[in-house]
From Swiss-Prot:
E.C. number(s) listed in UniProt: 6.2.1.3
Catalysed transformations (reactions): a long-chain fatty acid + ATP + CoA = a long-chain fatty acyl-CoA + AMP + diphosphate
GO terms for MF: ATP binding; long-chain fatty acid-CoA ligase activity
Pathway membership: Lipid metabolism; fatty acid beta-oxidation
A Pfam family reported for this protein in Swiss-Prot or TrEMBL: AMP-binding
EC class of the enzyme, as a word: ligase
Description of what induces expression: Repressed by FadR in the absence of LCFAs (fatty acids of 14-20 carbon atoms). When LCFAs are present in the medium, they are converted to long-chain acyl-CoAs, which antagonize FadR as to its binding to FadR boxes on target DNA and thus derepress transcription.
Protein name: Long-chain-fatty-acid--CoA ligase
One GO BP: fatty acid beta-oxidation
Lineage: Bacteria, Bacillati, Bacillota, Bacilli, Bacillales
Cited InterPro entries: AMP-bd_C, AMP-bd_C_sf, AMP-binding, AMP-binding_CS, AMP-dep_synth/lig_dom, ANL_N_sf, ATP-dep_AMP-bd_enzyme
Its biological purpose: Involved in the degradation of long-chain fatty acids.
Keywords per UniProt: ATP-binding, Fatty acid metabolism, Ligase, Lipid degradation, Lipid metabolism, Nucleotide-binding
Amino acid sequence: MNLVSKLEETASEKPDSIACRFKDHMMTYQELNEYIQRFADGLQEAGMEKGDHLALLLGNSPDFIIAFFGALKAGIVVVPINPLYTPTEIGYMLTNGDVKAIVGVSQLLPLYESMHESLPKVELVILCQTGEAEPEAADPEVRMKMTTFAKILRPTSAAKQNQEPVPDDTAVILYTSGTTGKPKGAMLTHQNLYSNANDVAGYLGMDERDNVVCALPMFHVFCLTVCMNAPLMSGATVLIEPQFSPASVFKLVKQQQATIFAGVPTMYNYLFQHENGKKDDFSSIRLCISGGASMPVALLTAFEEKFGVTILEGYGLSEASPVTCFNPFDRGRKPGSIGTSILHVENKVVDPLGRELPAHQVGELIVKGPNVMKGYYKMPMETEHALKDGWLYTGDLARRDEDGYFYIVDRKKDMIIVGGYNVYPREVEEVLYSHPDVKEAVVIGVPDPQSGEAVKGYVVPKRSGVTEEDIMQHCEKHLAKYKRPAAITFLDDIPKNATGKMLRRALRDILPQ
């Protein structure tokens, strides 16, 4: 079984059930499956072969689902890319990923025209029309490669032969966010994606009664598995939100009686801070899921109290398809914890020599299971560093309690060493978030001539008039001296990536320290 065959099975069993809703449109499972087959046929008719690479530069839309599953059905490897990346970033991924075809919105045509000479391997450009007129390219060479999404979907004279994938075939190359160095392309297999989506769906009890809000970006692995693949494996309905905003999410949840919402902590913070947010806005929600970054306990508690919902924190990473841990809702959760290992996945905390550590000791979290990638594309040294004896070394520092619950302490590379003492940014950030006038907070290490490094805090205040002294006094009550920020800078906003994860590296690069 794989994602495509499971969706086919669902379409056969529940043809008239609604697979997805987008704005005022809906699509049944039978309709979705037919579009997927036609897209797979169209790709093959256009010259794409099993093993070729196709990049998706699309926002949240039914086109993303059709293209994703259609490519997999034709045996083609999908390379999802954030369409808002810079030309340099996109060019790197298209080149490094050996992309042969691109699917993107028509507004991306000028971008492709400006860089096509540096992309000789790209032979096909499929544009999704956003207006009535077909996009036109000035360059005749580009015009030769162009077609539209609608043309690819036109029924062919005869259905092509579907390419049944081998479980270990690469299905997706997912580029990491590149917090250090160049982004790395994690090769996720058909088995990786199916096993994780299936296990997540089972763990969360997803079924045809669920309406799942898809407000995270589809090109991100968190959304790909939790908001798209898992619901479609379960016969649920995917409620596609083109772009996250608190007002639109509240409206969507109410109109469609959504039952599951997944987001990163920043999204929950925006929802919580929204002036019109009230308890009955989430009255239909049976489950909220948080991932992508650690959620401050103060925010989790306040959000649950305001909206009357339960938030389950989980943990995952691109290289693990992504989910490895979830807080169980059948035997109690622990705020601040990422929960316990999900079915078929092992997690453990080890020392620098790979030896498992006892409960409560901090070490590196490593993961093993059918969800773990087979390696980084064209990066054997990085693969060897990340995968050892079947275990994925995550680079995250964690601890485990006696009940088997795991707690992320911080990224290894984000740890701050002050006068020889380890300071974990998350611990300091939890204290900052507990201040009533702090809306967002993040800390980094900055050079210090006396202690080697010092803690520097960045805060987005809830109101004007908050002073550095206010924050410092709060920290003095809750933190040892060496853990306290040496300085606080107030910002209007903290730099974030496409999924809302705060970017410490941007603070180091562009903000005064």
